[in-house]
From Swiss-Prot:
Biased amino acid composition, Basic and acidic residues: 230-255
Coiled coil (UniProt feature): 100-124, 204-248
UniProt-recorded name of the protein: Caveolae-associated protein 4
Positions bearing Phosphothreonine: 335
Compartments where located: Cytoplasm, Myofibril, Sarcomere; Cytoplasm; Cytoplasm, Cytosol; Cell membrane, Sarcolemma
Family: Belongs to the CAVIN family.
Keywords linked to the UniProt accession: Activator, Cell membrane, Coiled coil, Cytoplasm, Developmental protein, Differentiation, Membrane, Myogenesis, Phosphoprotein, Transcription, Transcription regulation
GO annotation, cellular component aspect: caveola; cytoplasm; cytosol; plasma membrane; sarcolemma; sarcoplasm; Z disc
Primary role: Modulates the morphology of formed caveolae in cardiomyocytes, but is not required for caveolar formation. Facilitates the recruitment of MAPK1/3 to caveolae within cardiomyocytes and regulates alpha-1 adrenergic receptor-induced hypertrophic responses in cardiomyocytes through MAPK1/3 activation. Contributes to proper membrane localization and stabilization of caveolin-3 (CAV3) in cardiomyocytes. Induces RHOA activation and activates NPPA transcription and myofibrillar organization through the Rho/ROCK signaling pathway.
Organism: Bos taurus
Gene Ontology process terms (BP): cell differentiation; muscle organ development; positive regulation of transcription by RNA polymerase II; regulation of gene expression
Subunit composition and interactions: Component of the CAVIN complex composed of CAVIN1, CAVIN2, CAVIN3 and CAVIN4. Interacts with CAVIN1, ADRA1A, ADRA1B, MAPK1 and MAPK3. Interacts with CAVIN2; this augments the transactivation of NPPA.
Isomerase as UniProt keyword: no
Amino acid sequence: MEHNGSASNADKIHQNRLSNVTEDEDQDAALTIVTVLDKVAAIVDSVQASQKRIEERHRVMENAIKSVQIDLLKFSQSHSNTGYVINKLFEKTRKVSAHIKDVKARVEKQQTHVKKVEAKQEEIMKKNKFRVVIFQEEVQCPTSLSVVKDRSLTESPEEVDEIFDTPVDLSSDEEYFVEESRSARLKKSGKERIDNIKKAFSKENMQKTRQNFDKKVNRIRTRIVTPERRERLRQSGERLRQSGERLKQSGERFKKSISNAAPSREAFKMRSLRKTKDRAVAEGPEEVREMGVDIIARGEALGPISELYPEALSETDPEEASATHPPQEGGEVSTPEPLKVTFKPQVKVEDDESLLLDLKQ
């Protein structure tokens, strides 16, 4: 008994030890699971935060792309406006060049006139003997004075000295020199302006300005839209165009199929004929006579209705014909009785105009 009691005590102690060990292991496992779950939760939170950041970046990128598109539209509008303004400037330069040519021709004419006047003045100054006659009549005096040169001055100057008095000093030379200086100034200023305009609107300068403008435009384009993105946009446009063409083709095919599937007017007419024939057969010979159908037998034999109108009869018509005309014994086919066919005037049957054919065997 004592031995059994000691054995039972030992078993209890061993079981207690095992239970303690299992409890410790369970606690350790629970702790590890909790730590792992915490790590997983931290990872999930970090992933969600990164996803939110990515979404925000995508929104920012979309806004930037929209702003870039708006800038592109504005730039295209400004580019078109600048092109229009440049064309106007070219037209104005052409007009200015034509006006400059006219002014140049006028200046040359004035220059020749001035040279002639200078030559005359030199001759007069060399001789220093001229006379100015001033008189007034009923007509108003002209504002400009005309200097008359007498031929006798060149022939005999000594006789002229005896005849004429000393010339009056009218200080006309000083006035003329002032006018000559003004004309020279105008001439110089006109030439300088013409030269400046020619230099500004020369072919070389215009080509340089065009090249610089094209370079700036290309730089702005490459900064705003890369060539890869431009190629992608072009490909997407081609795809959209192809899809539109396919949709058009499918719509045309659908229309054709509907038009082919729709019954024709002849089919409606044949159906109306069949309905009238069925009504006439159902009503009987008396009602047909009342309607005014005149059937008279003739010597000519007509074939069955299926031969006359093969398209109008349906699949059940041959069966009805076989029921109404059963084949005779010995393989002989019964010939139908002769008929007279009468046509009525046009009558509307179900809103379709057709000729009614009344047949009776």
